[in-house]
């Protein structure tokens, strides 16, 4: 696993509760921001970029030319004074990302995995080497994904959900998350497990290694190792045999980096 350190439910609750809540915005403007009235003008009459950075404001572009295109990125409360005297949709446009958000997205630059555009991965998620996260997947805070595991398109891993090594969570599947109450147990999926498309694994359920959850199943009870479960609610329909193992085998080439 890389990146985050494993957190308990109580630690996640404290992390969210104590986090500075931010409304991140990206402002694109032509015109000059109100550096003086916002208190960001240096003695030499130029923008005080150090003071801006200390407030978490990132500025891009030529701020010495009035009508050149500029970009300002930061928390709305810090950025708003810079727009005094300017007119929205005339002098500038704003893109918002959330409102009073407590948990940023995960910085994935150091992760040795394949993460496709459009995946939403929150901070404090652990991702193993050669894992694959497909577009549209949503991974909530505290989730863990083992080495070589694929999270397919549109799948959802709720808070603290855990998936072992070399497993596959099918498109649209949901592993229910548990952050509150803190005493509740999260979903745990073992190694070499296949969870079919649009299946749902309810809070606290454990799926044993080597098992298969059929597409569309709703799993409300623990699943033993090396069995196939199907239905609503899911029930064991057979043990894993050679034919099933062949049909559900993973493709290593998809995990190459």
UniProtKB/Swiss-Prot annotation:
Keyword annotations: Acyltransferase, Amino-acid biosynthesis, Diaminopimelate biosynthesis, Lysine biosynthesis, Repeat, Transferase
Pathway listed: Amino-acid biosynthesis; L-lysine biosynthesis via DAP pathway; LL-2,6-diaminopimelate from (S)-tetrahydrodipicolinate (acetylase route): step 1/3
Gene Ontology molecular function, alphabetical: tetrahydrodipicolinate N-acetyltransferase activity
Example GO BP: lysine biosynthetic process via diaminopimelate
Keyword Protein transport: no
SUPFAM superfamilies: Trimeric LpxA-like enzymes (SSF51161)
Disulfide bonds: none
Superkingdom of origin: Bacteria
Family per record: Belongs to the transferase hexapeptide repeat family. DapH subfamily.
Protein known as: 2,3,4,5-tetrahydropyridine-2,6-dicarboxylate N-acetyltransferase
Organism annotation: Lactococcus lactis subsp. cremoris (strain SK11)
């Amino acid at each position: 696993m890389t990146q985050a350190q494993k957190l308990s439910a109580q630690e996640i609750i404290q992390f969210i509760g104590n986090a500075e809540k931010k409304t991140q915005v990206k402002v694109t403007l032509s015109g000059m921001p109100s550096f003086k009235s916002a208190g960001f003008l240096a003695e030499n009459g130029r923008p005080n970029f150090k003071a801006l950075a200390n407030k978490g404001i990132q500025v891009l572009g030529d701020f010495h030319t009035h009508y050149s295109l500029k970009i300002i990125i930061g928390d709305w409360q810090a950025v708003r004074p810079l727009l005094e005297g300017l007119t929205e949709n005339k002098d500038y446009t704003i893109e918002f990302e959330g409102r009073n958000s407590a948990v940023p997205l995960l910085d994935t630059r150091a992760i040795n995995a394949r993460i496709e555009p459009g995946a939403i991965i929150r901070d404090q998620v652990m991702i193993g080497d050669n894992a694959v996260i497909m577009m549209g997947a949503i991974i909530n805070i505290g989730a863990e994904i083992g080495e070589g595991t694929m999270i397919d398109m549109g799948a959802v891993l709720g808070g603290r959900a855990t998936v072992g090594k070399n497993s596959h969570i099918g498109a649209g599947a949901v592993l229910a998350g548990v952050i509150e109450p803190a005493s509740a147990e999260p979903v745990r999926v073992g190694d070499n497990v296949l969870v079919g498309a649009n299946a749902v694994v309810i809070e606290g359920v454990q799926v044993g290694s080597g098992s298969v959850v059929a597409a569309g199943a709703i799993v409300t009870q623990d699943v033993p190792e090396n069995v196939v479960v199907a239905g609503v609610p899911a029930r064991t329909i057979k043990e894993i045999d050679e034919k099933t193992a062949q049909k559900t085998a993973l493709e290593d080439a998809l995990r190459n980096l």
